[in-house]
Each structure stands twice: as C-alpha cells, then as structure tokens.
C-alpha cells in the first residue's frame, strides 16, 4: 500500500501534544495501521498454514528490537496460525536519521533456528543495508525457510538485494516516528506514525 504524503496536520489536543511541536504531520493513523496489519496477518496465515500443518512447528517470528516490538505484537495476534517469538537487536543508526551501513549485533537469538520457518519482522526498511546483512546472517544458520515482513518500506529499499515478502506501507523518504519508531528513544509511544519536524534533528 503506497502512502504518498502526510495525511493530516497535527492540531492541538491530539496525542502529539505529548511532544509539543515535534510532530510535523500524521502519515498513518492508528486505524490505518491496524487495518493493514489485519490484512498482512491474513496473508501470512494463508501462506504458512499448510507449512505449519506439515512440519508440526510454529512459525518463528524474529523481531528486530526495539522499533518492531509493537508491530510484531499486533501482527502475531492477527496471524491465524501458531507463532513463537525471538528477539534480536542490531544497530546501524546511533542517533542519526540515516543508516550508516555499519551493522553490529547488540543481542543475538536465544535459540537455534536450523530447520525452522522464519519470518523476519522489521519496523522500517530504508537503505536496506541492515536487512541485507541480517538476511545473510540468518540464512547462514540454515532455517527451513526465511521471509521478511516490514511495516514500512522507503524508496531506497528497492536497491537492496533482499526480497521482502510482506510490506505494510510504501512511504516517502521522510524521517518518521511513532508506533515503536523513535528518534533518540522518544516518540515510540505514539499510536500513529508521523513525520518529525526537521528542527528536532537538524
């Protein structure tokens, strides 16, 4: 689903007032996000239902901390097949608004994924550099299958050599926050996704 521009400006009294003046506009409302997650859950369930029945194993959702935590929680409830969670933290950001391309593992998986059907759950794919590295890393651990689901995809992601099976929204190249997405650990608690006023990070 393509989103070409911000859907509305922030007006006084909205939850953006948690951070007065920081949110420039709303890109995706909470209702739009939840409706799309329901669609993704149904699609994923249809794709994995037979595999789950054949292998007798639950679909393993590998979530990249911290931004995707809210997304994977809602997504798992929308997928009509049993799922399990694994968490991994990698970083290529620091406190900037663009990917550095330098990836380091902050937290690795707690279990072996050999022979498992794995779905990587991402919050946003921008340059695709982090996801490309993560996909190679997990592939080397010999899962039965490996696919990617991201809530948001930015234009530059098309240049990454990674197939993304499930995309929530294609969005512009704006720096976005909310619904788990942060800038310097702030704004994750917003129920919607909005664009950050450039004065915050310039």
Curated annotation (Swiss-Prot):
Top enzyme category: transferase
GO biological process: GMP biosynthetic process; GMP salvage; guanine salvage; hypoxanthine metabolic process; IMP biosynthetic process; IMP salvage; purine ribonucleoside salvage; purine-containing compound salvage
The organism of origin for this protein: Mycobacterium tuberculosis (strain ATCC 25618 / H37Rv)
Cofactor(s) needed: Mg(2+)
The keyword Glycosyltransferase appears for this protein: yes
Described purpose of this protein according to its UniProt entry: Purine salvage pathway enzyme that catalyzes the transfer of the ribosyl-5-phosphate group from 5-phospho-alpha-D-ribose 1-diphosphate (PRPP) to the N9 position of the 6-oxopurines hypoxanthine and guanine to form the corresponding ribonucleotides IMP (inosine 5'-monophosphate) and GMP (guanosine 5'-monophosphate), with the release of PPi. Thus, specifically recycles hypoxanthine and guanine imported from the external medium, and converts them to IMP and GMP, respectively. Cannot use xanthine as substrate.
Residues the entry annotates as binding Mg(2+): 122-123
Positions of the catalytic residues: 126 (proton acceptor)
Binding, GMP: 154, 175-176, 182
Pathway linked to the protein: Purine metabolism; IMP biosynthesis via salvage pathway; IMP from hypoxanthine: step 1/1; Purine metabolism; GMP biosynthesis via salvage pathway; GMP from guanine: step 1/1
Stated regulation of activity: Competitively inhibited by acyclic nucleoside phosphonates (ANPs) with Ki values as low as 0.69 uM. Prodrugs of these compounds arrest the growth of a virulent strain of M.tuberculosis with MIC50 values as low as 4.5 uM and possess low cytotoxicity in mammalian cells. Inhibited by pyrrolidine nucleoside bisphosphonates, which are also able to arrest the growth of virulent M.tuberculosis not only in its replicating phase but also in its latent phase, and to arrest the growth of M.tuberculosis in infected macrophages while having low cytotoxicity in mammalian cells.
Reaction catalysed by this enzyme: IMP + diphosphate = hypoxanthine + 5-phospho-alpha-D-ribose 1-diphosphate; GMP + diphosphate = guanine + 5-phospho-alpha-D-ribose 1-diphosphate
InterPro entries, alphabetized: HGPRT (IPR050408), Hxn_phspho_trans (IPR005904), PRibTrfase_dom (IPR000836), PRTase-like (IPR029057)
Localization (cell): Cytoplasm
Domain of life: Bacteria
Miscellaneous: Is a target for anti-TB drug development.
NCBIfam families noted in UniProt: HGPRTase
GO MF: guanine phosphoribosyltransferase activity; hypoxanthine phosphoribosyltransferase activity; magnesium ion binding; nucleotide binding
UniProt keyword annotations, A-Z: Cytoplasm, Glycosyltransferase, Magnesium, Metal-binding, Nucleotide-binding, Purine salvage, Transferase
Entry similarity comment: Belongs to the purine/pyrimidine phosphoribosyltransferase family.
Subunit structure: Homodimer and homotetramer in equilibrium. The presence or absence of divalent metal ions, as well as phosphate, can affect the oligomerization state of the enzyme. Likely functions as a tetramer (rather than a dimer) in its biological environment, which is the most active form. The dimeric structure is also active though ~50% of that of the tetramer.
Principal cellular location given in the protein's record: cytoplasm
GO CC term, one of those recorded: cytosol
Enzyme Commission code(s) on record: 2.4.2.8
CDD domains: PRTases_typeI (cd06223)
Residues binding diphosphate, per UniProt: 66-67, 188
Record protein name field: Hypoxanthine-guanine phosphoribosyltransferase
């Amino acid at each position: 689903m393509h989103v070409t521009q911000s859907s509305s400006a922030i007006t006084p009294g909205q939850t953006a007032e948690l951070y007065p003046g920081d949110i420039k506009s709303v890109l995706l409302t909470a209702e739009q996000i939840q409706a799309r997650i329901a669609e993704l859950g149904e699609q994923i369930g249809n794709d994995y239902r037979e595999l789950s029945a054949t292998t007798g194993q639950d679909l393993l959702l590998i979530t990249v901390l911290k931004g995707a935590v809210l997304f994977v929680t809602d997504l798992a409830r929308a997928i009509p097949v049993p799922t399990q969670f694994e968490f991994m933290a990698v970083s290529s950001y620091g406190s900037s608004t663009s990917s550095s391309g330098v990836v380091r593992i902050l937290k690795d998986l707690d279990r072996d994924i050999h022979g498992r059907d794995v779905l990587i759950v991402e919050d946003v794919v921008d340059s695709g550099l982090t996801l490309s590295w993560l996909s190679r890393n997990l592939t080397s651990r010999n899962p039965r299958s490996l696919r990617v689901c991201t809530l948001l995809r930015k234009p530059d992601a098309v240049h990454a050599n990674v197939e993304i099976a499930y995309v929530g929204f294609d969005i512009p190249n704006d720096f976005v926050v909310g619904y788990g997405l942060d800038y310097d650990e702030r704004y994750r608690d917003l129920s919607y996704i909005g664009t950050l006023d450039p004065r915050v990070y310039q």
